[in-house]
Amino acid sequence: MISFIKGVLIEKDPTALLIDVNGIGYEVFVPMTTFYTLGDIDSQVSLYTHFVVREDAQQLYGFKSKVDKKVFQELIKVNGIGARTAIAILSGMDSKTLLHCIENKDYALLATVPGIGKKTAERLVVEIYDKLLKMANEIYAQTSGTTTTSQDSQAQQAPTSAVLANSIFNESVDALLALGYKQKDAEKMSRSAMGDATTAAEVIRKALQGSIRSKR
């Protein structure tokens, strides 16, 4: 069991990282809420991890905090919710927002996540309600807000060229597709979130937040 990983960030793409640990490269899948907190390539990274073994694959999932890891582990215990859907949930909302959804039985908001319909949302609330409430103190104790990465800080620099804008748009679409959104929806969400953003992380974050707000 691999429960924690610390190493050098070699590659950094939305939802997937490559981390060098003493010369061995580990592919780690992460929710966007963790991706936003990462530093630059070649920087040190430390993540709490959950190792999933299937017949056709072995995958490592990483999280910025032990609490997020625990929430992920509870999510994948719910019938009908696999690791990919759990990652999509924690990409569209942080643990605090998820707790609010569970407490308020906000099925409509949960159903905005790709792969979750109304019935699955209802089952999720029933199966995870007590467990998540027991974790409430841990969840609320987490530092609010998102750590600003060096990539985000670069957003105040030179205007985005057409080529860079296209690259950012495509990267955002690819990330949303990886989270389970349909091509048409991923393109629409990315286009609406572009604005004056100069990094794909900005666009993805705005796209996911916009999707949540539109359902409230």
Swiss-Prot record:
Keyword check for Phosphoprotein: no
Chain intervals for the UniProt region annotation (Domain III): 164-216
SMART domains (alphabetical): HhH1
One biological process term in Gene Ontology: DNA recombination
Chain spans, region Domain I: 1-64
InterPro entries for this protein: DNA_helicase_Holl-junc_RuvA_I, Hlx-hairpin-Hlx_DNA-bd_motif, NA-bd_OB-fold, RuvA, RuvA_2-like, RuvA_C, RuvA_C_sf
Signal peptide: none
UniProt keyword list: Cytoplasm, DNA damage, DNA recombination, DNA repair, DNA-binding
Record-level GO cellular component terms: cytoplasm; Holliday junction helicase complex; Holliday junction resolvase complex
Pfam families: HHH_5, RuvA_C, RuvA_N
Gene Ontology molecular function terms on file: ATP binding; four-way junction DNA binding; four-way junction helicase activity
Region named Flexible linker: 144-163
Compartment(s): Cytoplasm
Chief location category: cytoplasm
Keyword presence, DNA repair: yes
Domain notes: Has three domains with a flexible linker between the domains II and III and assumes an 'L' shape. Domain III is highly mobile and contacts RuvB.
Purpose of the protein: The RuvA-RuvB-RuvC complex processes Holliday junction (HJ) DNA during genetic recombination and DNA repair, while the RuvA-RuvB complex plays an important role in the rescue of blocked DNA replication forks via replication fork reversal (RFR). RuvA specifically binds to HJ cruciform DNA, conferring on it an open structure. The RuvB hexamer acts as an ATP-dependent pump, pulling dsDNA into and through the RuvAB complex. HJ branch migration allows RuvC to scan DNA until it finds its consensus sequence, where it cleaves and resolves the cruciform DNA.
Subunit structure as annotated in this protein's UniProt entry: Homotetramer. Forms an RuvA(8)-RuvB(12)-Holliday junction (HJ) complex. HJ DNA is sandwiched between 2 RuvA tetramers; dsDNA enters through RuvA and exits via RuvB. An RuvB hexamer assembles on each DNA strand where it exits the tetramer. Each RuvB hexamer is contacted by two RuvA subunits (via domain III) on 2 adjacent RuvB subunits; this complex drives branch migration. In the full resolvosome a probable DNA-RuvA(4)-RuvB(12)-RuvC(2) complex forms which resolves the HJ.
Stated family: Belongs to the RuvA family.
Name of protein: Holliday junction branch migration complex subunit RuvA
Species in which this protein is naturally found: Francisella tularensis subsp. novicida (strain U112)
Lineage, broadest ranks: Bacteria, Pseudomonadati, Pseudomonadota, Gammaproteobacteria, Thiotrichales
Gene for this chain: ruvA
